[in-house]
Each structure stands twice: as C-alpha cells, then as structure tokens.
C-alpha cells in the first residue's frame, strides 16, 4: 500500500485569507499537507517531520514589535522553506534582512521580471515576447523587503516592489512577495509544483484511490470487529463517510436516516433508494416529521428554530443509538476545514472562526468512540473520493442545503402546509434551472416561503394565497455573493409554472440582494 503521509508539507498560518488555498493547491499537486498556527513549538514540528515548510501571508506588519514570527527551528530543520508575502517578509527579517512599510499598499495584478536563476522559477515564463522571463502574479501587501538577508539573491522584481522574490539556493530557502496559491497568478500551480515536487522531493501519492485505501485500512485498524453508528443525512460528507465505512466494515455499520419533514421533495425516498437499494447499506429510516413539527409549533425566531431542530435531532438519534446495544463507535463526517476552524492557537493570536458542530467531542452521556474518516480532507477532495466510490456526480455537486433544511426557508413559524407548498415550488425552480443549463452556472439556488398572502386572479375567480421568493446567487467562497442575473424569460417560465401547478401560491418574486448586506439564506 502507498504511504500517503510519507512526504508531507507543513503550512504555517499567519492569518491570510488565502491560507487554505495554499493547502488545497499542495493537495491538488498530489502531496499531503497540514495547516498549523504559526506559533507551534519545535517539538511539534519535529514530531510532524515535514519534507518542506511553507510560511503563509498574513494581515500583520513585520515592522511591529509583537508581529508573528516563524519558530526559529523552521530555518534549522534542514528542509526547504517557501515564504509567501508576509511569510517572505518574516523570513527576510528573521535571517538578517530588512523590511519597511510601503508608501502604498499593492493590491492586484503585477508583472514580475525574473532575475538570476532559481529552482523555484524553473521553466516558468508568462511573457514569451519579453527579453527577460516574466510572471503575471497577484499582489496583496503593505510592507516590503528592502535588504536581502546574507546568502540570498534577488530573483524577481516589479516596478513598485524592487525585491519581489528572493532565494538562497544552498539552504533551499525561497521567498515570493506575491500569492502563487490564487488562480490570478498564472503560473502559480507550476511554481508550487517546483517547490513541493522538484525542490522538496515529494512523491505525489495523495490521490483519491490511495486516500480510499488508506482510510479503509485505518477504519479497520481503529474499530476492528466493533459496530459503528452513523447519522446519514444524504449530504456529501455523511454519504462519503457511509461508503468508506461500508467498504471497511460492511454490515457492522448501522446508518440512521432521520426524516425530519424539512427535506426537499422526495428526498427521503431518494436517500433510502440510493444507500439501501443501490449500495446495500444497513440503514434505518426514522420518520420523525410529526415530532419535529410539534416541537416547532409557535416558534418563529430563526435561531430558536435552529436550536430546536438540533435538539430534536439529537434526541431522536440518541434514542435510535440506544436500540443498537452492541454499537461501540459513532461516525461523523467531520472534514478538514471544520478542524482548522475549531483549532485555537495556544497564544490566542490565531483567531477561531467558529466552533463547528462536528468538532469538540460528544455529549457526555454518549459513551462511544469517535470515527472521523474525512478528518484530513477538504470539501473538493471529499467530492473526488465520493466519485471514486461510485456516488453520482449530480448528487456530489448539488447546491448546499442548510442543516435545519426547510426550517430556515419557511420564514416564521413552520407548518406542514407551508413545507409542502415550498417543496413543490422549489422542485419546479430547480428542475427549470437544470433544463435551461443554469443550475451549475449559479452557486446556490432555492425557494423561500413568505408567510404573507397576496391577491391573485385565476380564470374568472379571485384567489388570496401565499407568496414565495426565488433566490439564486453566484459566489466563490460564500463569504460574499452576487445575485444571479437569470434571464427574464426563464424567471417568467418558473413563475408561471409555480403559480399554475402549486395550488396555494399566488405570487412569485425574485430576490436581488447581494451579500453583503443580505445573507444568502433568509434566516
């Protein structure tokens, strides 16, 4: 079996918004890497035993007294080091160079002229018409290096940044002021490949097939002949977790699918057909619609609804798990970004974005071991694993669906009537997006039920029925988003179908709010 962790890159995070992108690019190259806060100890680095180290960018200034520094051991570990943006600046300062604040922040595209020979830029040139090789890059920095450390040579320069890249070929230390991890830097992936593969000497074993083989072996080693329980929702993470576990332990996996009555049209049947009939998993369906709706009666505040849905789910799942008396382990679909977001730096310098529901252990009363086979994987890697395991692409690439389901897409109090109307309207919206080729052009699309009535005319009669809003957005990271400019004729067709086919809806509106100021979901 290939050892997928034999060669590995350590990425130290100084707080850049692009840091996770560095890790995803290294994984894309085919090499395992981990992302740690910058203030790790020498002992932790020694134990991880990296083949190479990358220092990320960050928002701080190296000219300030308390700014983050790389552990000194990074430069004494005997492995190649690449500093990106702030990472280059702290490398320069810590090794005897000088950095100063720029007269202006440089943000956007730039052309770097390459000087002197360096292994980092081998075979790279984005301007074949120039006498000197050049790279089209993305800059985002305030400070700049003004004096090279001893042993370093200048390898790149721009009109506003005289030292845009530097290298010490004997120690294999490299610095770039730009961001090779973003797609705006044309040869960024090739540059990172030069560092990870050619300079660090990593073998590219990190592939879906090898990851599956490794995950199955680790599950077998962890749980042996014990039985495992998993809450299967039909989402990407729990679905891939289920198939990995099934491949490893077969019928010793018990899947519990809690149908809360807040799912999309026919979704419960589709989950059972997919995992029960097609893949042959040991799966129990718990029809808990009445229980959820009863618990939600009279609750109209969004956060209170979320908490109640979460509480009822835990109660239902706990009851089912107690019926499985021989179960010793609980499986969860925790993925790597969940782990990163929940890891607090020991100095408090690295900010915790949020505490994720999948990280931080189990309720005290659940005396089960924890199995997390996706814990090392990014979402795009989970999808690739799912594809290799036989999950259909349309399921793996489906738009995000919130954990509370329709509970946050029915505004105000949740009633069965509202959910049924919303399910039908949303199914028409999604079907028409598929048929028109727009589904994969937008990042997320859904329908929202508004608890207001509007007058309509059907034939010779007057009707007074409910209103729904269509929402479609385009985004890269879901942190900001633009509303999607769907064609008017498509919106008209969707509206006509919903009003004519869904008895109880008299008006359809389209949400043209961006994020910010609006959030993507209404609640």
UniProtKB/Swiss-Prot annotation:
Active-site residues per Swiss-Prot or TrEMBL entry: 85, 179, 181
Superkingdom of origin: Bacteria
List of residues binding ATP: 233-239
SUPFAM superfamilies linked to this entry: Adenine nucleotide alpha hydrolases-like, Class I glutamine amidotransferase-like, GMP synthetase C-terminal dimerisation domain
Keywords in alphabetical order: ATP-binding, Glutamine amidotransferase, GMP biosynthesis, Ligase, Nucleotide-binding, Purine biosynthesis
Reactions catalysed, as given in the entry: XMP + L-glutamine + ATP + H2O = GMP + L-glutamate + AMP + diphosphate + 2 H(+)
Pathway stated in the Swiss-Prot or TrEMBL entry: Purine metabolism; GMP biosynthesis; GMP from XMP (L-Gln route): step 1/1
A Pfam family recorded for this sequence: NAD_synthase
Domain GMPS ATP-PPase, chain residue ranges per copy: 206-398
GO CC aspect terms: cytosol
Limits of the Glutamine amidotransferase type-1 domain: 8-205
Gene3D superfamilies: 3.30.300.10, 3.40.50.880, HUPs
GO molecular function: ATP binding; GMP synthase activity
This enzyme's EC code(s): 6.3.5.2
Biological role: Catalyzes the synthesis of GMP from XMP.
Assembly and interaction partners: Homodimer.
Protein name per the record: GMP synthase [glutamine-hydrolyzing]
Native organism: Mannheimia succiniciproducens (strain KCTC 0769BP / MBEL55E)
Lineage: Bacteria, Pseudomonadati, Pseudomonadota, Gammaproteobacteria, Pasteurellales
